[in-house]
UniProtKB/Swiss-Prot annotation:
Keywords: Disulfide bond, Neurotoxin, Secreted, Toxin. The lineage of its organism: Eukaryota, Metazoa, Ecdysozoa, Arthropoda, Chelicerata. This is U15-hexatoxin-Mg1a. Contains 4 disulfide bonds. It comes from Macrothele gigas. The keyword Zinc-finger does not apply. Expressed by the venom gland. Intrathorax injection into crickets causes paralysis prolonged for more than 60 minutes, followed by recovery. It is found in: Secreted. Belongs to the neurotoxin 25 family. F7 subfamily. Its main location: secreted. One of its GO terms (cellular component) is extracellular region. One of its GO terms (molecular function) is toxin activity.
Amino acid sequence: ECSKQLGESCKCNKQCCGATVICGTIYVGGKEENLCIEKTSNNAILNFFGKIAHVVENGLSFSCD
């Protein structure tokens, strides 16, 4: 069952709520962070959360099992 919303930190995909939301890696100030992001993410969503960073294209995503 999902418990995280878009922009929240996560450990794996199924934690993230939303059909197109995955747990992906972005870089914030050179540091890796795992956040719930849209699969088709663009920076608008991340900017909304103050995470102005570059999204890894088709970034790493994490499975819980």
